[in-house]
């Protein structure tokens, strides 16, 4: 039986709207849940997430005016499971590398801030300087770096369950790989389930 752990980005990835031919986030989730239901009933697949990720997903749906019946179905097909905060074994090397990467990013962010300050002192529209600083600082410090407790919990849950982690988050995938956890992006996830279901349909 294949197990999947769902990250927030597995649902909110904007490419899914085009894939499913819909416009709203809640319509993506509706299609997702239909696929999950079929995969669980016909293939025995199971789907999990953590309480923090489920809270994030519900928050996105509530803000998108999602029908309440769809939100209520989330817990039917996606099982919510807490991670063990004392039993999970993560190699010390993973944390050593992570801390080193955080330090490198912070140093890079400092250089970005210094350069932006110099440019601002040379003149120009302050609002434009701030926008550029935010964009470059975010690029320097956050892109491809795990920066969320919810993401870390998703990776640990996948490790504990021996599950495949579904996410489009580059930093989360990097960590998952170091933990020996398989990681696939949301589009591959959808196409994988569809392919399995098509095989069952063709071969009974």
Curated annotation (Swiss-Prot):
Note one Pfam family from the annotation. Answer: PIN_5
Taxonomy, superkingdom: Archaea
Alphabetized, the UniProt keywords read: Endonuclease, Hydrolase, Nuclease, tRNA processing
Q: What is its EC number?
A: 3.1.26.5
Q: Which GO terms describe its molecular function?
A: ribonuclease P activity
What chemistry does it catalyse, as a reaction equation? Endonucleolytic cleavage of RNA, removing 5'-extranucleotides from tRNA precursor
GO aspect biological process, one term: tRNA 5'-leader removal
The record's comment on protein family reads: Belongs to the HARP family.
Q: Which NCBIfam families match?
A: PRK04358.1-6 (NF003345), RNA_lig_partner (TIGR03875)
What's this protein's function? RNA-free RNase P that catalyzes the removal of the 5'-leader sequence from pre-tRNA to produce the mature 5'-terminus.
For this entry, the protein name equals: RNA-free ribonuclease P
Q: Which organism is it from?
A: Ignicoccus hospitalis (strain KIN4/I / DSM 18386 / JCM 14125)
């Amino acid at each position: 039986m294949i197990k999947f752990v769902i990250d927030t980005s597995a649902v909110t990835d904007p490419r899914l709207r085009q894939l499913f031919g819909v416009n709203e986030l809640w319509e993506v989730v509706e299609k997702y849940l239909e696929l999950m239901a079929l995969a669980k009933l016909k293939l025995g697949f199971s789907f999990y997430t953590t309480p923090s990720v489920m809270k994030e997903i519900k928050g996105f749906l509530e803000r998108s005016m999602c029908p309440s019946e769809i939100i209520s179905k989330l817990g039917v097909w996606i099982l919510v499971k807490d991670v063990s905060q004392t039993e999970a074994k993560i190699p010390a090397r993973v944390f050593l590398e992570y801390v080193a990467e955080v330090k490198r990013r912070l140093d890079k962010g400092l250089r970005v801030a210094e350069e932006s300050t110099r440019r601002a002192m040379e003149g120009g529209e302050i609002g434009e300087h701030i926008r550029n600083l935010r964009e470059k600082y975010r690029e320097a410090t956050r892109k491809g770096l795990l920066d969320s407790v919810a993401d870390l919990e998703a990776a640990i849950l996948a490790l504990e369950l021996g599950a495949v982690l579904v996410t489009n988050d580059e930093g989360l995938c990097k960590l998952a790989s170091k933990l020996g956890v398989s990681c696939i992006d949301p589009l591959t996830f959808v196409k994988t389930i569809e392919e399995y279901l098509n095989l069952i349909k063709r071969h009974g």
